[in-house]
A protein has these predicted regions:
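DNA major-groove recognition helix of helix-turn-helix/homeodomain DNA-binding modules
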Residues: 49-70
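Short, structured beta-strand segments at or near domain termini in extracellular proteins/domains
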Residues: 289-305
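Short, charged recognition helix plus adjacent turn
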Residues: 68-93
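Functional-site microenvironments in short loops/helix caps that host divalent-cation chemistry
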Residues: 105-107, 113, 148, 154-289, ...
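Recognition helix of helix-turn-helix/homeodomain-like DNA-binding domains
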Residues: 31-49
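A short, Lys/Arg-rich alpha-helix, primarily the initiator
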Residues: 1-19, 55-58
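A short glycine-rich, aromatic-capped structural motif
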Residues: 95-152, 169-173, 195, 245, ...
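Conserved hydrophobic/aromatic packing and binding residues within compact polymer-binding modules
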Residues: 12, 26-27, 37-40
Length: 310
């Protein structure tokens, strides 16, 4: 399927045509006004919708049936759209964790370009969560263990509209406790960075072009977390979401006693803070409305579980 790196009015019209919808029907499908659709289509490739609408369009294409996707591919030439930069996805196996059911992707052992200076560094094989741990995911842990829920959950229950948003208001110890319960770990700084940048040391998950529209950062004006599968065009070479923006992510790597590294930036962060090679850390007891996590697992350990061997 053609992957739209940056939507313009031209691709929007192609999607509506592929879906065989009128302007009124298409506007209702996206949850925007008819006037907005007409404006986008009239201006064609000269207009780029706001990041929140880019995400809506990504989702509309992703959720379309195969016939619609095929028609869209034909209308757009089947190539990367809008001349935007992209990097080749890395073929790797995806699995569902046997305990939590969360989708994880394998990152094969290899050298990658680490840190701001792109230092070659070997990292053994591991799996990493494709998505951030959501409120719904974390609720299973709270229910199973009696662990204290995040402070913004009313009466110990997360707001229903935030079910698929990343869990926040968690300390490093909260995140580590979840990972242990799930039979996983928190990723190290090296594991996280490799999953974000690929083996060739791209500046961002999608390549070297600074494109804030591909992630949830302050410049986009979203002003809150977004669902964990929102920014498809901003995924990493391994297909991992939200490696730039949405929430800062706790990592296993200790910077100094009592402090742990975080990466990825957040909806509260300026875009330049979301660069995956950048360093950030915080006290293990820190928690905020822009800090969450995802999990990882050593390849051998997870594959033993998957194959039912000890």
């Amino acid at each position: 399927m053609a992957n739209v790196q940056v939507w313009t009015g031209a691709e929007i019209k192609a999607l509506r045509t592929a879906m065989r919808l009128s302007i009124r029907e298409f506007a209702a499908h996206l949850g925007v006004s008819e006037r907005m659709i007409s404006k986008w289509e009239a201006k064609g490739s000269d207009i780029t919708p706001l990041p929140v609408n880019q995400a809506i369009l990504d989702t509309a294409l992703r959720m379309s049936d195969p016939d619609t996707k095929a028609r869209f591919k034909g209308l757009t030439g089947g190539a990367e759209i809008s001349g935007a930069e992209t990097i080749e996805p890395i073929g790797s196996s995806q699995v569902r964790h046997p305990m939590t059911g969360s989708p994880m992707v394998k990152v094969d052992g290899s050298i990658y370009q680490a840190g701001p200076s792109n230092t070659p560094l070997w990292v053994p094989s591991y799996y990493i969560d494709i998505y951030l741990v959501s409120n719904a995911d974390y609720a299973q842990f709270v229910a199973a263990t009696g662990h204290e829920p995040p402070q913004h959950w009313e009466n110990g229950t997360f707001p229903k509209e935030l079910a698929n948003h990343p869990v926040v208001w968690v300390t490093w110890k909260d995140a580590a406790a979840y990972a242990k319960w799930a039979g996983k770990t928190l990723p190290t700084a090296q594991q996280w960075e490799k999953a974000a940048r690929g083996t060739r040391g791209a500046t961002y998950p999608w390549g070297d072009q600074p494109t804030p529209a591909k992630c949830n950062v302050r410049e986009n004006g979203v002003g809150a977390t977004t669902v964990v599968d929102c920014y498809q065009s901003g995924t990493s070479p391994y297909g991992v979401y939200d490696m730039c923006g949405n929430v800062w992510e706790w990592l296993d790597t200790q910077s100094t006693p009592g402090r742990r590294e975080l990466k990825g930036g957040a909806w509260t962060s300026q875009f330049d803070r979301a660069v995956p090679s950048q360093f950030n850390d915080a006290n293990e007891t820190m928690c905020d409305d822009d800090t969450g996590f995802r999990c990882a697992a050593p390849a051998e350990d997870l594959e033993r579980l998957l194959h039912g061997t000890e």
